Amino acid sequence: MENQFKNNNNSSSIETSNQFSNKKTNRLDSFVSVSELHEEAKRLLPKMAYDYYASGSNDQITLAENENAFSRIKLVPRSLVDVSKVNTKTRIFGRDISTPILIAPWAMQRMASQRGELDTVEASKEFNTIMTLSSLSTTSVEDLSSATNGNPGWFQLYVFKDRKVSEELVKRAESIGYSALVLTVDTPFLGKRTADFKNSFKLPNGLSLKIFEKLMLSNLDGGLNQYIATMIDPSLTWNDLKWLKSITKLPILVKGIMCPKDAELALQYGADGIIVSNHGGRQLDTCPSTIEVLPYISKVVRGRVPLILDGGIRRGTDVLKALAFGANAVCIGRPIIWGLSTGGKDGVLKVLNLLNSELQLAMALTGITNISDINNSIIWDQNKYIKL
């Protein structure tokens, strides 16, 4: 039977704005999962670049758990529900998007493709989703704004020891069309990333941190650990969130929340959104997976601000589970890098198309037709049925 969950104009069963599958057939058509794209990216990328993108901290226990925890969560199939039309459209900060799958900030994307962040932002625009640009980008904010006609998405920010640097970045991003700030709060120091240490990681010749060129801060020759230690302020507190809100009108999402108490503090100090994230398993090893802590943070947030899960998403069923546990959306990082490495812009679109199609199928098989109808009743809980 032909799969009805392909995102194309010929399918009346699916409402979607994505038309990527109308493009001519190419080698990307042979990839049917994110894991296959991962293997291809591993084959194509130089070892130092691949290790930077793929590795976690210490023994990489949290890195593995981010993915493995999803497999322990079971979904409940439903029958005889009209699922002839499944719609993944949603809204965040007043913007209508085609999918709850957002693109996480990821540094130095021109190690993955020649155009790097330009490929990614153009794919996000075509798919009608949101990309967050990393502060450690190898493409300038101005170039990305131009490529999207002044609507490049969200901007990820570290607070630097020199607050003037952070303030200038905020003003610069706001002036050219970025619609939200993503404040990363889980990196007072860089996690112990063994692979980067062994590789003496630094940017390849010809690449630089473009965002900082005007500030004469783009040189990474001393290595990432030294750069972070020199630039990022480990004395950051919740009062700095208040300061940040005082210098911008943009909504601010706090990224790196893994503790319910921190979620409450984020709300108290004015966060406009919360991203549950452990930095892709690259900071504190042996901390829980993000999907494990999401339900507890959702109980704190109670729908007051957008709640986003980051980490471990590799299948559309993972997206559905995150939404069922209370997330409004998810962010994907490494899958985007694997697509970017394999096929540039079209590779990123391939990843988005794969995951969104899988999400649509999972929604249909659990009897759901709209994102707003997803709740935790689709999560198998033996205790609910043990007395039946």
Curated annotation (Swiss-Prot):
Where in the numbering of this chain does the FMN hydroxy acid dehydrogenase domain appear? 26-384
Which reaction(s) does its UniProt entry say it catalyses?
Answer: glycolate + O2 = glyoxylate + H2O2; a (2S)-2-hydroxycarboxylate + O2 = a 2-oxocarboxylate + H2O2
Sorted alphabetically, which keywords does the UniProt record give? Flavoprotein, FMN, Oxidoreductase
* PROSITE patterns assigned: FMN_HYDROXY_ACID_DH_1, FMN_HYDROXY_ACID_DH_2
Q: How many cofactors are bound and how? A: Binds 1 FMN per subunit.
Show the segment(s) annotated as Disordered: 1-21
The cofactors required by this protein are: FMN
Catalytic residues identified in the record? 279 (proton acceptor)
Q: How does it assemble?
A: Homotetramer.
Q: What task does this protein carry out?
A: Catalyzes the oxidation of glycolate to glyoxylate, with a reduction of O2 to H2O2. May use other 2-hydroxyacids as substrates.
Family under the similarity heading: Belongs to the FMN-dependent alpha-hydroxy acid dehydrogenase family.
The protein in question is named 2-Hydroxyacid oxidase
Originating organism: Dictyostelium discoideum
